[in-house]
Amino acid sequence: MLAALLVCAMVALTRAANGDTGKEAVMTGSSGKNLTECPTDWKMFNGRCFLFNPLQLHWAHAQISCMKDGANLASIHSLEEYAFVKELTTAGLIPAWIGGSDCHVSTYWFWMDSTSMDFTDWCAAQPDFTLTECCIQINVGVGKCWNDTPCTHLHASVCAKPATVIPEVTPPSIM
């Protein structure tokens, strides 16, 4: 009990010292003492931080914008993660860029963060492998599915990066 209180106090003091009380933090790890957090305005899901950017940008400019925050356009790895991302984009009402592309090798889709493309939610007849359509737009049509579209279109975007792990601090033993 005392250890839990000390950890909570340490977290509160760290946040106050950083002047950043708007961060989203989650206890993780087998000991329950590790803390991961996201910057202010970012939202956490499965150990990653996501940010919806409503600015209408070309895909490459959206990626550059993410990189300025140490992130990439989001990769999506499960239906649950996609549901979370859709909620970030005003419940799926706003078309947005994510980090998938086949611009380098047509028909070979990859994520900008170099993770495997182990989940997709393409709309019917997509991707259609049109050479000028090599970036992924989400929230298309009634099904809110994915479409390969020209990278020069203007859309909002979703960035993602790993959550920051705050090192576990072992409080001094009290004798």
From Swiss-Prot:
Keywords: Antifreeze protein, Disulfide bond, Lectin, Secreted, Signal. The keyword Transcription regulation does not apply. Residues 17-33 form a propeptide. The keyword Protease does not apply. Pfam families: Lectin_C (PF00059). One of its GO terms (cellular component) is extracellular region. It is found in: Secreted. Residues 1-16 form the signal peptide. CDD domains: CLECT. GO terms for molecular function: carbohydrate binding. Residues 36-163 form the C-type lectin domain. Disulfide bonds join 38-49, 66-159, 103-134, 123-145, 135-151. Antifreeze proteins lower the blood freezing point. This is Type-2 ice-structuring protein. It comes from Osmerus mordax.
